[in-house]
C-alpha cells in the first residue's frame, strides 16, 4: 500500500467505491462470515471513520450504500481526503447520506502540496494562492457540511532560517483563518514524519504544531494528530496528546510499522482510545491506513481490530 497522503487521496478520488450491507451479498455458504460482520453492528464508543473504498471487496459502487454499510457496522463517521476532487453530485450525495444517518465527515484535504515551499514564504503571490485555495475549500465545505479542512504547510526552505519560516507560517495561517473562520470551518494542521514517508516537509511534530497553533491564536487553527506519523517522529503518544489537547481537533489512525489496522504494530491503541474517550472527545478519528490481510478476510479483520481496541472499560 502507498503510505503517502497522496496515495490515499488518489485512491479516494479514483476508486469512488462503495459498500453494501452484508445480507445483500453473502450467500448461505458464507453464513459464518455474515454473522461475524453482523456482530459489529453496535456503535463504537468513539467516532472511528473509514474512508470510501476501505471495504471495497464487499462493495458495489454506490456511495450511499457505502455509508449505510459503515453505519451498520457501528461506525458513526467517515472521511474522504479527496472529496474536493469529486464531482459536485458525488459530494452532495455523500453529504446527504451521512446526514440521513447522523454521521460525521472527518477532515477533507484542502491544501497539501508536498512538492513546493508555500506557507514558509513571505511572498504576496503565495498568500494570494493560499487565500484562493481557502475560498475554494469554503465552497466545498458548504456542499458537504464540512466542519474540518486539513492543511499541510508544505516543504521546508533550506535557504531560510527556521525561525523566519515559522513566523511566515504563522502569518499565512492567520490569513487562511480570515477566510475559514467566518464560514465556521476549522483548519487542522497535520504534522507528517520526515524519516520514512515525507522528507523535507516543514511540519513534523506535535509540539511544533502546538507552538504554531498557540501563536496563531485563532479558534479555526488546530491540529490533526496522526498517531502513525507521531509514533515515528516522537512517540510518547498519550503524554503528547495530553500536552497538546487544547489544540487537537481530529485524529488519524494507523499502526506502526506497516501503517495497517490496530494490533498489527507496536502501538497500544486500546489505551490510547481509552484516554481519548476519557477526555469526552466527540470528534472524528480517521482510519487512514491499510489492511494487513487481503480481500474480504482483511476487511472483516479491520472491523474486528477496532472492536478489540474499542473494548476498553469506561
For every predicted segment, state its role.
Residues 65-83:
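Catalytic domains of carbohydrate-active enzymes, especially glycoside hydrolases
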Residues 2-71, 145, 203-225, 229-314:
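Histidine-acidic metal/acid-base catalytic patches
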Residues 79-99, 153-157, 197:
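Glycine-rich, proline-tolerant flexible connector loops at the mouths of alpha/beta enzymes
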Residues 54-56, 84, 111-114, 155-157, ...:
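Active-site-proximal loop/turn and secondary-structure-junction residues that shape catalytic pockets
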Amino acid at each position: 500500500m502507498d503510505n503517502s497522503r497522496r496515495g490515499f487521496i488518489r485512491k479516494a478520488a479514483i476508486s469512488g467505491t462503495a459498500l453494501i450491507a452484508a445480507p445483500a451479498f453473502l450467500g448461505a455458504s458464507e453464513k459464518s462470515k455474515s454473522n461475524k460482520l453482523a456482530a459489529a453492528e453496535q456503535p463504537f464508543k468513539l467516532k472511528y471513520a473509514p474512508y470510501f473504498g476501505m471495504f471495497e471487496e464487499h462493495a458495489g459502487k454506490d456511495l450511499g450504500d457505502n455509508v449505510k454499510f459503515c453505519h451498520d457496522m457501528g461506525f458513526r463517521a467517515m472521511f474522504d481526503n479527496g472529496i474536493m476532487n469529486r464531482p459536485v453530485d458525488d459530494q452532495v450525495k455523500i453529504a446527504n447520506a451521512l446526514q440521513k444517518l447522523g454521521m460525521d465527515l472527518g477532515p477533507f484535504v484542502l491544501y497539501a502540496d508536498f512538492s513546493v515551499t508555500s506557507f514558509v514564504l513571505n511572498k504576496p503571490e503565495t498568500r494570494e494562492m493560499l487565500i484562493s485555495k481557502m475560498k475554494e475549500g469554503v465552497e466545498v465545505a458548504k456542499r458537504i457540511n464540512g466542519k474540518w479542512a486539513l492543511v499541510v504547510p508544505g516543504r521546508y526552505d533550506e535557504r531560510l532560517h527556521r525561525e523566519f519560516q515559522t513566523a511566515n507560517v504563522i502569518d499565512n495561517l492567520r490569513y487562511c483563518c480570515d477566510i475559514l473562520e467566518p464560514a465556521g470551518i476549522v483548519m487542522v494542521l497535520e504534522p507528517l514524519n520526515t524519516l520514512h514517508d515525507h522528507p523535507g516537509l516543514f511540519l513534523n511534530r506535535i509540539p511544533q504544531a502546538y507552538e504554531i497553533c498557540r501563536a496563531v491564536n485563532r479558534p479555526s487553527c488546530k491540529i490533526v494528530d496522526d498517531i502513525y506519523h507521531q509514533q515515528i517522529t516522537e512517540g510518547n503518544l498519550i503524554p503528547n496528546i495530553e500536552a497538546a489537547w487544547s489544540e487537537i481537533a481530529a485524529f488519524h489512525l494507523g499502526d506502526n510499522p506497516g501503517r495497517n489496522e490496530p494490533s498489527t504494530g507496536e502501538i497500544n491503541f486500546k489505551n490510547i482510545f481509552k484516554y481519548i474517550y476519557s477526555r469526552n472527545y466527540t470528534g472524528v478519528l480517521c482510519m487512514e491506513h491499510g489492511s494487513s490481510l487481503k480481500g474480504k478476510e482483511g476487511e472483516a479483520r479491520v472491523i474486528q481490530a477496532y472492536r478489540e481496541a474499542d473494548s476498553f472499560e469506561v
